[in-house]
Amino acid sequence: MRILLYSGKGGVGKTSLAAATAIRLAQMGKRTLVMSIDPAHSLADSFDLGGALFEAQTSDPLQIGPQLFLQEVNINREMKRHWGAISAYVTSVFRTSGLEGVEAEEMAILPGMEELSAMMYVNQYRRSGEFEVVVLDCAPTAESLRFVSLPTTLEWYMKHVFGLERSLMKAVRPIANRLGPVKLPPESYFQNVQDLFDKIAGVDTALEDSSVTSVRLITNAEKMVLRETQRAFVYFSLHGLTVDHIIVNRVLPDEVQDGFFRSIREEQNATLAAIEQYFAPVPVRRVPMFPNEMLGFDRLTQLASKLYAEGEDPAAITRVTRPFTFARDGDHYE
């Protein structure tokens, strides 16, 4: 299974390009899932599906075309499906502090839960082979980096803290629960954590395997956006992932000759030259600005035709080496 991550600064067009890529893959006969791992989902909106996913109230993949499936992780559903014991304990703690009802349940949704739920699905599909390609519409850069670092972070916790914490709680729980109003986590809480870790086991290896996972960084021909893309490029490499394309979205097309856009074009040309120079030898693709919003299957198909050549496979493996590698030297990396 191929995993394609579309990441970049918020507002650069990640969702539209991920959706267009998924359409092209499905048209080529590949069973494709496009999944949003952004807490502020807009993937269904990009396909102009209206309230289809909202009305379905599901976290499961929804078929939206031949060989094409869409998934937006619904964290409230995931809490019941995968986080039962953890959610129940955290909710009980908040209720002890005075929060009741919906407020306590909402506060029990901890940072990272949505990303970890998405990671579990990716690993599930990798193991089952249900899809040939999974296209991930990532959150803005910082959240995307947290997503790819989750397996390493959780592995460290499981190796160095979890066992000790679990044993300590088992020993002191009978006494502590009698003395204070806040109960210590039950054994089911720790078993739930162990089950979650088991569900993502091995996904870090898949993410670092360039024959499985590729990162596509989306940027605009703007200096501020470029700087964040440069940082993301280094950070993804630091985490062991391979960036195989830089995609510059919303480039002014040649037919725009109005004088109002002259200075914008000059700035874009200067930034495009800097992009080519900085990211070489990683291929840089340019996608023109369209005169209308890229919304719905027809326009996304049109977008795909500008992003990929006719007959080109977006899932093809084009790079297997990372431009940056890092090695630890004492207390720093080189």
Located regions from the model:
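C-terminal lobe/tail of nucleotide-utilizing enzymes
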Residues: 200-334
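Flexible phosphate-sensing "switch/lid" loops adjacent to ATP/NTP-binding sites
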Residues: 2-7, 12, 17-28, 32-210, ...
